[in-house]
Structure formats: C-alpha cells, structure tokens
Regions:
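Acyl-CoA-dependent O-acyltransferases
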Residues: 1-261
Length: 261
C-alpha cells in the first residue's frame, strides 16, 4: 500500500543574466537530442503461465532472437540489475548467454527444425539465462569486477591492464542492445535510450494483475518500447519492434504446446 504524500510545492528559480544563455543553450541541445530518438511502442498478450516463474529470462532470450532476425547476428547486450541483496545501492550488468541463444535463433528460422528441438533449445537458453542471473545477483558477475580493476589502476596511477586495450574488449562492451524490465500491477511503459550510436534501448513492462487465482509467474501481458537514433541508418525502432513481436508469437506458440521452459 502506498502512503499519502503532501501536495508538491512548485519551485521557482531565479536565473540571472550570467547563466541565462547557458540554460537556453542546454535547452536547445536537449531538444536536438530528443528529436534524434525514434520510438516504437506496442502491447503483447505475453506468454501466460507458460513463461514460468521468471518471465524476465524468457524475454531476455527472446530479445536476442529478435535482434538476430533483424540484423543476422547477435550483439553485445546488457541489462542493468540491482545488487540490493548483497551490495545495497549498487548495480551490475546482466549479459545473455550467446551460444544457446544463437542456436535457438537458428532453429526457429529453420523450416525443417522440429518443435521438440526448438523447445529443448529454448529450455537450454532460459536455464543458462537464469544461471547467469543468479550469479550476478550474488555479486559474482564479471562486469563489476572488471570495473573495479579499472578504477584500482586509475586510483594507483598505473597503466590500464592490457585487457582494457584489447579490441575484443571494446567490441564486447559496445552494447548495441540495452534492456530494462520491470513488473507492475497497472502496467507501465519503460523508455530508455540506446547506449551506442548504432544501438537500441528496449524497455519491457510486465503487467502482473493482482488476481489470487493466477498461478505464480502469470503475466497479464507485456508493454514493449523500442528506441533507436534516427541519425543511424543501420537501426530502426519499428524494424526491431516487428521482429520482437514475431519472436514473442513464435515462443508463445511453443509454450502453449509444450509447457514452460
């Protein structure tokens, strides 16, 4: 239950001539940034009880498959995750498991692949995602440790370890897909911008109706918001959004026939 809050008071700022031009310049810059963001939103019925107790893992896997359909390959992906259970106030980045997601994406696009094989690959990918999630929530994710190593070197005035100068590391941290997921009873639209010029931001709101007869993990639907930069010709929010919707439909059909992953 939410506590009643007092009515907010309007704050009035006195802007002098010394900072007035800077404020106007910042407003124009912000408007130009907002004008460069392409947004595509849609609602989906979700996966129902077939999603299991952790639908977030299923959605993460589905988004990997959708990116593969849209661009023909997987990409570096991150989902900011709270570490409040072990490090209050801290976050880490959750990455999806690449190999099982790639195998699933290829099987779903193979007209000769049997549904039983597709379902087995889906289970493998979701289990791998759940395993990574538990690892990160326990404070054992690699991203925070690597960041700690970088900051320790900077604080000590030492050269950065070679791993941070390797082109592979730069590619692995070029997050073309940044994901945000939140559960709520009323349903909400989550918009976040891309992290890189040729990337996407994807927010997924899990609508969880407060019905005591619903099984654990039952989802009342999904609200998906996809963002991209209009200045990039390699990305289009509606294009990825259509791929996401198609993958949700494909996985929903598998789950209705074969049960939760």
């Amino acid at each position: 239950t939410s506590l009643p809050l007092p009515r907010p008071q309007r704050l009035r700022f006195s802007i002098g001539p010394e900072i007035g031009p800077e404020v106007e310049r910042a407003k124009r810059h912000l408007d130009s940034l907002a004008a460069d963001v392409d947004v595509h939103c849609f609602s989906h019925e979700g996966f129902g009880p077939g999603a299991g107790p952790r639908p977030e893992a299923l959605v993460q896997v589905a988004l990997q498959v959708a990116f593969y359909r849209a661009h023909g390959s997987l990409c570096a992906t991150c989902e900011p995750t709270s570490l409040r259970g072990v490090l209050p106030g801290c976050t880490d980045l959750l990455r999806p498991p690449g190999p099982p997601c790639l195998a699933l994406a290829q099987a779903l696009d193979d007209p000769h692949a049997q549904p039983e094989l597709q379902m087995a690959l889906l289970r493998e990918a979701v289990e791998a995602q759940n395993s990574r999630t538990q690892e990160v929530l326990a404070g054992q994710g690699p991203e925070r440790h690597l960041q700690g190593l970088r900051q320790a070197a900077i604080a000590a005035g030492e050269p950065l370890p070679e791993i941070f100068l390797d082109p592979t590391y730069a590619q692995a941290t070029h997050f073309r897909l940044c994901i945000l997921q939140v559960r709520s009873r009323e349903g909400c639209w989550l918009l976040r911008g891309p992290l890189v010029p040729d990337g996407y931001g994807v927010g997924v709101g899990h609508v969880c109706p407060p019905d005591p007869q619903d099984p654990p993990g039952h989802s009342g639907g999904l609200r998906v918001a996809v963002t991209a930069f209009t200045c990039c010709h390699d990305t289009e929010a509606a294009h990825l959004g259509a791929a996401i919707r198609g993958v949700f439909d494909s996985l929903g059909g598998l789950l209705r026939c074969h049960g939760p992953p």
